[in-house]
């Protein structure tokens, strides 16, 4: 959502807290998809690798390079996610099918990594990982 404040446009991200049961169900579905025999990392995991020239350290490409990670390392970290690492849910203003993005914070090599993802599709489900980068702000964990 974009709002005007003193004549300047600012972007507002709508945040909510999913119920614990919803997070558990999301993680079960995520692990089922990642554990399928026919899981194809090239088509079943969509990883957004957008650079942030104004904040490179908090971008997915920088974090992957710093951790020496590839897509399979991300899959391994996604399989490890727990309810206790859940932080919040955000409304995906760019794609309302489904509208919720689940946000997790995971300690990797002594640094907090911000992970934002959702599961898309009806017949053929895919994992959309919008963010996998070092956390810019402190995170809260309602179920820790």
Task: Identify what each model region corresponds to.
Residues 119-144:
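Enriched for short, Lys/Arg-rich terminal
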Residues 69-72, 86, 114, 134, ...:
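Sequence-level detector for tyrosine residue identity
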Residues 6, 11-21, 25-98:
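Compact soluble domain cores
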Residues 79-126:
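Functional cores of ribonucleases/endoribonucleases
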């Amino acid at each position: 959502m974009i709002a005007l404040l003193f004549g300047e446009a600012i972007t507002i991200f709508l945040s909510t807290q999913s119920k614990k049961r919803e997070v558990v169900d999301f993680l079960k579905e995520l692990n089922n998809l990642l554990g399928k025999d026919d899981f194809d990392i090239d088509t079943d995991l969509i990883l957004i690798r957008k650079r942030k020239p104004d904040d490179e350290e908090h971008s997915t490409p920088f974090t992957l390079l710093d951790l020496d990670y590839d897509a399979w390392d991300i899959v391994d970290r996604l399989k490890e996610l727990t309810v206790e690492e859940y932080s919040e849910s955000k409304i995906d203003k760019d794609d309302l099918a489904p509208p919720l993005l689940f946000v997790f914070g995971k300690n990797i090599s002594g640094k907090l990594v911000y992970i934002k993802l959702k599961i898309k599709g009806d017949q053929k489900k895919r994992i959309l990982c919008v963010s996998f980068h070092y956390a810019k702000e402190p995170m809260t964990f309602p179920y820790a």
